[in-house]
Amino acid sequence: MLAVLLALGLALRVAAIVPYAMGPNTYSDDNGYLTSGITFARTGYIAYADPGLQTTAIGPGMPLLLGGLIALVGADPAGLVAAHIVFSCIGLLTAIAAYLLGALLCSRVAGLIAAGLCVLEPALLSVNIVFLTETPYMCLNLFAIYFLLASVREWRWGRYWAGVLCMCGAAFFKGLGLLALVAPAALLLRRRENLRPWLLRACAALAAFVLLFIPWWVRNGVLTGEFVPFTANRGDIQLMGSYIGFGYPEGTYEEAVLQSDREAWEQGYQDDMERRFARRGEMGKERLWQWFTENPLAFVASHLLYKPLALTVSHLRTVDLMPDRLMALVWWGCLALAAWGLLCPRLGGCARSGYYAPAVYLLVATLVTAVYAPLPRYGVSHVPIWLVYSGAGLQDLGGRALRLLRGKDEIH
């Protein structure tokens, strides 16, 4: 059954890609990542939108991944279509991870439903077919959570190292990948296990992480003279986030951008995009501090309630696969099923050890991600975990419906 779902997912993704002569492109961040891949394949340098400018604005993950694909299939139109298809298959690996996690926490049926939802959910399909970091990140992140939870449930070095390497791989795309540790930590605390053996294991994981990232840190230090662990903050998201929520200081994001651009021209650094984005970050921090000091209750409510909720209910559409309202309706339905999946174990539903550990991760990751701007693109990384609970919820509802029908048949 899982193979059938994966075949269906591949067919849908290929059908969504091939109408575009060079593969779908939103001419936004994905275009910058494509440029970074082509640049890395040809020069070995990590750049972004400008092929001639090395940068720390993105992590090494996308240049390495896309650079490898471009080196294999080329950058001509047919090669780009092939690269999109191969890239979208990573989304199908995410469905496999959802199946494994659902089976680990609930049942194989719940895992199959979760995998099917990952294959069919419009936002995930929409993201999988374009070159965005979210596709490889959420795949590696979900596998990391699965392997780390499995190693806590039944210790094996192989599982543990698989989880650690997947987590480090996710961090190559987004530094938030390290938050995967929250899930096994929650399970360890819940089970009140002796943590001494885990100190040695944690040290081994830390050593592996440092060894993997040392080349990146050295490269960034030589390039910028600073320690940049993952990526340099581009600043515009910080500024944008200071205009989202309750009771924030007056003004608009567009006005602030115009002001920062005017300063850049007046002070002669209009061609230095890194410095211009850094200035926006400074303006964002100033506004956030002003917001906190002038209206602390609104600031706290915005960051603990409004932004996380906005991040959760939003959905991302990169290309026109279906009407936006229909995509929103599908996502709301998945969230409703996930809510029931989180509740049903308290009402006699199926749940195995560690069932709520990914939910703890989801809470922490949502709060951290929503600190700045709760953009739909940032929320899509959490969709597969929501769908794992959606699968559990749908299985539980189906089981209750079957029992109800059988009860009626026995009465008659």
How does the language model describe each region?
Residues V81, A95-L120, C139, Y160-A162, ...:
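Transmembrane-helix signature of polytopic, membrane-embedded enzymes
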Residues A7, I85-C106, C139, F143, ...:
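Transmembrane-helix motifs of polytopic, lipid-linked glycan transferases
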Residues A144-Y160, A170, L189-R192, L394-L397:
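Membrane-interface transmembrane helices that cradle and orient dolichyl/undecaprenyl
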Residues A123, I129-Y137:
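Short acidic/glycine- and proline-prone juxtamembrane loop motifs at membrane-interface regions
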Residues G9-L12, F87, A114-P122, S126, ...:
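Short helix- or helix-capping micro-motifs
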Residues T56, P60, L64, G74-L93, ...:
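Loop-to-helix entry region of an early transmembrane alpha helix in multi-pass inner-membrane enzymes
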Residues G221-K307:
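Membrane-proximal stem/loop segments at transmembrane-domain junctions that anchor or position
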Residues V18-N31, R42-G67, Q290-W291, N295-F299:
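Membrane-proximal lumenal/periplasmic loop motifs of glycosylation machinery
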